[in-house]
Structure formats: C-alpha cells, structure tokens
C-alpha cells in the first residue's frame, strides 16, 4: 500500500496529511497485535517526567525495517501515520494529558478576553505593521474585518481537536505564514497606497517585510486570543514536556511560538 498509494508529502516539513495509508496502517497494527506494544510504550512514557518519546522513535525504526521502507517520502508518510495512531491511543488511555480542567480554562479565557479587546495602539504594536485605521480598533474587530487574519485564527482554533504534535505544529506553522503575509500586504500597501490593486498578490507575498521576532510574536499572540483552544494550558504543558522526537526546524519554530504564546 505504501508503495502503490498516491500521497502528498511536504518534504521540507516532513509532513503528510491523513490519507489512505493511515487507514491501512492502523488496521495492519491491530491485525498484528501491535497495539499491545504501543500501549506498553505509552504507559512507560506517561509515568516519566518529562515525557521521553525515545521509545516511540525506536518503534518507528522497527516498522521501517518490518516494512522495508527506504524511500524518504515513504518514511515521512509512515512516521506521520504512526504518530497519529500513537498519540490518538495515548489520549484514549490518558485523556488528562491534554484535557483542561474548568478553573484553568476559565482564568486563561479571561486573560484572552482582555487582550482581544485591546487596541494595537494600547499594547504598542509597531504602527508600520498595521493600517492606520486599525490602530484604535479592538483586535477582535480587526480579525473579523480581515479575511487573512480570520484564516490564521481558524487554524489556531482547530488545535484543540488534534491529539498529535505533527498536526498541531503544522496548523500553527500555517497560521504563522498567514500572519507573515498579512504584514507584507500591510507594509506594501503603505508604500504604494491606492495603487495596491495594480499589483499581483504573489508579488506582495514575495515582499521582504522588515519585521522583528517581537513584532510577529505579539501579532501571533493577539490572533491566538480571539478564539483560543479550550485546552490551551494543558496542551502547552504537554508539548513543553516532550523530548525524544525530532521535527524539522520550521515545526520546532512553530512549537516555540505556540508554547511561548500560551
């Protein structure tokens, strides 16, 4: 199936979306009684602090050998499929790893509510990154009036529905790219004014925006507060305690942004 199936792979991120092989692989694991081994590994990891996922990496290498996987893209598909199966099972056995209790969720929600009703001017957002008419508007209103920022907000809102880090980091990374494009469009429009409609969107996106880490981090934080995942604090704690699994630099970058934001 891995050889014959057509699949999508983002090589630079070592990511492949859920597909036919994922469906086949979970059946393969159950058929070969592989879930018992997964359960044993999960319970070992759960009782460790911080969570060391080296045993998951060893399991992945075992399946690479069993299935004789040598092609890089096939290895990526296998890693993503096993990660989804493994972390879904982890959540079934130990839902407390990412389930938020009401008191933590309530306090975090209040903080987010305060921030999303703040204005860019009130929290010292760099005026070069925003249209002048946005500076005195509550940030929640800015997001609702911008299709681009709504897209980023939706990517982040979806995080609470995932149990595995690869999909969490991919959606976070997608939101970061949207924020970057928003800033590029805003700074480009400031330079060309009403002539913005004369330029192709791809040209605007290719523009190099002069944006510091602090600038993009603050914008990302504010977008996150509009519709934050209900299990944000638990999610952050779990991701912070993970070790033993490697991700490509862009996804490690996304992890850093997400955990730091929460």
Cite the ranges covered by each PLM segment.
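Alpha-helical bundle/repeat cores within regulatory domains of eukaryotic proteins
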Residues: 154, 166-262
């Amino acid at each position: 199936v891995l050889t014959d199936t057509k699949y999508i792979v983002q090589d630079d991120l070592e990511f492949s979306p859920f597909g036919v092989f994922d469906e086949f692989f979970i059946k393969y694991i159950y058929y070969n009684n592989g879930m018992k081994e997964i359960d044993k590994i999960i319970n070992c990891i759960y009782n460790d602090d911080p969570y060391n996922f080296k045993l998951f990496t060893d399991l992945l290498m075992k399946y690479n050998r069993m299935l004789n996987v040598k092609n890089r893209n096939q290895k990526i598909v296998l890693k993503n499929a096993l990660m989804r199966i493994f972390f879904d099972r982890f959540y079934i056995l130990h839902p407390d790893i990412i389930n938020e209790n009401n008191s933590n969720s309530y306090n975090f929600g209040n903080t987010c509510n305060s921030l999303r009703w703040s204005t860019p001017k009130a929290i010292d957002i760099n005026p070069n990154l925003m249209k002048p008419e946005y500076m005195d508007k509550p940030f929640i209103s800015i997001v609702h009036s911008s299709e681009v920022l709504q897209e980023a907000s939706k990517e982040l809102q979806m995080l609470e529905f995932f149990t595995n880090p690869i999909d969490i980091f991919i959606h976070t990374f997608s939101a970061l790219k949207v924020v970057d494009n928003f800033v590029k469009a805003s700074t480009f429009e400031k330079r060309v004014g009403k002539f913005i409609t004369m330029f192709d969107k791809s040209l605007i996106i290719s523009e190099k925006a002069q944006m510091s880490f602090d600038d993009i981090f603050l914008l990302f934080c504010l977008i996150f507060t509009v519709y934050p995942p209900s299990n944000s604090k638990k999610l952050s704690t779990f991701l912070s305690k993970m070790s033993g699994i490697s991700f490509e630099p862009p996804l490690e970058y996304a992890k850093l942004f997400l955990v730091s934001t929460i």
